[in-house]
């Protein structure tokens, strides 16, 4: 699954939930059609309730414009929307995990064609940058998330890393601090001292977190892929020799450990440390697990005082030109992006709203103290290179292959170079 809502496990959705909202018909005339990802994981948490209310309120305020919303599982939405566009049946809008391939094809309206200047300027800066191709904003960030390093305070106390009451909080500065904590946890019999989910579900997130903490990442300052950079090779050599080989990452090989499995183990109290996002913290607290959350420690190879960004993730609203409904789409998006609506949606799923003003004025589920930590991290985060049209293909290659870099008898450099070669080929196909 993609995007900020990667925690959602769709509840057996085999067909779109069409007819959501106040509309009827096939999207013709003055009916707008939005295809959106399903963020809920049960009927009770389905996104349908949100869209029903928003579309009804919008039509009441704008008589004559109806909105039809179709909900699709995260596993299907990118493929299905691509199929719709290719067959000449593009929706008016889509909310999903990627946009740049459609922008590269000239299929999308830009933000300045849809929103007021103040609305366009309201997006958090890292999100606006990731939503732009060149200097033009095509992907309108909707909700977002960032990652922090979580630790189980009870397991840390048992290992003598913090006091029994959890104070003072653990404050790792470098990878060596994390390694030392993992060793102490292993000595106490913790099953996963550090959970390293490099399985195919979401390996690209975990890999990027570690690469950024060593001054690396997926792309250079010019936006070109740098997957096999010296910094990234050093990162995976360290992970392999210092964490995986000594057994500090648990019994499941990282290449086979998916994020969902790592999160489930954390909620069972079997994980000392892992990288997580707001919804996991809320789930853990509901189960009585006290969680500490800190910034990812940096590589021992970086200079003193360097403060690399964390990983940010966003989901994107985009508007297609095909049906020529620019004015109606603009009215609807101005309505959806009102603070109360954006904060309500984000609060339902413990995500972060994408705009400056919605972040400052919580409503609905709102931001609590826990979420504020993630918002602070998001303001300085680095997002995936989603504005590169090849990203969907490249991210899939990373997810399926990066875990091999820490397997026994394998050269991390060779694995990274193989991924880089595939990324280069994908980039050429998209130009």
Regions found by a protein language model. Name each.
Residues 2-100, 414, 421-431:
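Conserved N-terminal structural module of periplasmic/extracytoplasmic solute-binding proteins
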Residues 112-123, 166-171, 193-198, 216-235, ...:
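Short, solvent-exposed loop/beta-turn-alpha elements that line the ligand-binding surface or hinge
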Residues 137-142, 147, 175-226, 271:
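Extracytoplasmic/periplasmic solute-binding protein
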């Amino acid at each position: 699954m993609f995007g900020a809502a990667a925690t959602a496990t769709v509840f057996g959705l085999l067909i779109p939930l069409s007819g959501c909202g106040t509309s009827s018909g096939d999207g013709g005339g003055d009916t707008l059609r939005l295809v959106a990802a399903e963020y809920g994981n049960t009927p009770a948490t389905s996104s349908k309730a949100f869209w029903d209310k928003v579309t009804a309120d919008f039509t009441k305020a704008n008589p004559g414009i109806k909105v039809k919303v179709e909900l699709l599982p995260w596993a299907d939405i990118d493929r299905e929307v691509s199929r719709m566009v290719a067959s000449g049946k593009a929706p008016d809008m889509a909310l999903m995990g990627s946009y740049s391939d459609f922008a590269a094809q000239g299929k999308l309206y830009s933000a300045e064609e849809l929103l007021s200047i103040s609305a366009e300027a309201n997006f958090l800066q890292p999100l606006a940058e990731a939503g732009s191709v060149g200097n033009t904003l095509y992907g309108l960030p909707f909700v977002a998330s960032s990652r922090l390093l979580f630790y189980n305070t009870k397991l840390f106390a048992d290992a003598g890393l913090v006091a029994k009451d959890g104070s003072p909080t653990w404050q790792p500065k470098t990878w060596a601090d994390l390694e030392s904590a993992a060793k102490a946890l292993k000595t106490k019999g913790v099953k996963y001292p550090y959970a390293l989910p490099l399985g195919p579900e979401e390996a690209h997130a975990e890999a990027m977190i570690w690469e950024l903490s060593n001054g690396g990442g997926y792309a250079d300052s010019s936006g070109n892929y740098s997957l096999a950079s010296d910094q990234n090779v050093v990162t995976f050599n360290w992970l392999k020799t210092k964490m995986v080989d000594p057994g500090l990452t648990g019994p499941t090989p990282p290449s086979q450990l998916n994020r969902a499995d790592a999160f489930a183990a954390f909620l069972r109290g079997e994980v000392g440390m892992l990288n997580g996002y707001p919804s996991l913290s809320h789930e853990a607290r509901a189960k009585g697990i006290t969680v500490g959350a800190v910034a990812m420690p940096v590589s021992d190879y970086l200079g003193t005082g360097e403060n690399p960004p964390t990983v940010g993730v966003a989901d994107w609203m985009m508007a297609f030109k095909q049906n020529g409904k620019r004015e109606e789409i603009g009215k609807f998006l101005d309505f959806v992006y009102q603070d109360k609506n954006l904060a309500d949606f984000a609060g339902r799923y413990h995500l972060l709203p994408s705009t400056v003003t919605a972040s400052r004025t919580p409503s609905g589920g709102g931001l609590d103290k826990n979420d504020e930590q993630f918002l602070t991290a998001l303001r300085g985060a680095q997002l995936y290179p989603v504005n590169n049209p090849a990203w969907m293909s490249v991210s899939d290659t990373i997810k399926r292959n990066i875990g091999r870099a820490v397997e026994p008898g394998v050269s991390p450099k060779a694995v990274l170079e193989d991924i880089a070669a595939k990324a280069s080929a994908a980039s050429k196909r998209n130009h």
